[in-house]
Amino acid sequence: MEIKVIKEEQNYLELQIDGEEHTIGNLLKGMLLKVPGVKFAAYSLPHPLITSITIKILTDGSISAREALIKAIELAENYANLFIDEVKKI
């Protein structure tokens, strides 16, 4: 996995993630939309034969786009840990 910043402003971040496809794209988009202050989050897979996605994040300015991404990743980690705990109970 390699992450490249395509464009960054205070409330906007566009990243290219090489070596990843829909799995991480859907996860990040879903978690980003749960972060307060995020107005828009989306990802695209430019071509099905290329394993690279582009993620776009736009916030209302109350949080930076980079901070929103970090919070979304932390949220995903919390969900994963909760899921692990529930599976262990089975």
From Swiss-Prot:
Part of the 13-subunit RNA polymerase complex. SUPFAM superfamilies: RBP11-like subunits of RNA polymerase. Keywords: Cytoplasm, DNA-directed RNA polymerase, Nucleotidyltransferase, Transcription, Transferase. GO terms for biological process: DNA-templated transcription. InterPro entries: RBP11-like, RBP11-like_dimer, RNA_pol_Rpb11_13-16kDa_CS, Rpo11-like. This is DNA-directed RNA polymerase subunit Rpo11. PROSITE patterns: RNA_POL_L_13KD. It is found in: Cytoplasm. GO terms for cellular component: cytoplasm; DNA-directed RNA polymerase complex. The keyword Nucleotidyltransferase applies. It is an enzyme of class 2 (transferase). Pfam families: RNA_pol_L_2. CDD domains: RNAP_L. The gene is rpo11. Belongs to the archaeal Rpo11/eukaryotic RPB11/RPC19 RNA polymerase subunit family. One of its GO terms (molecular function) is protein dimerization activity. It comes from the Archaea. It catalyses: RNA(n) + a ribonucleoside 5'-triphosphate = RNA(n+1) + diphosphate. Its EC number is 2.7.7.6. DNA-dependent RNA polymerase (RNAP) catalyzes the transcription of DNA into RNA using the four ribonucleoside triphosphates as substrates.
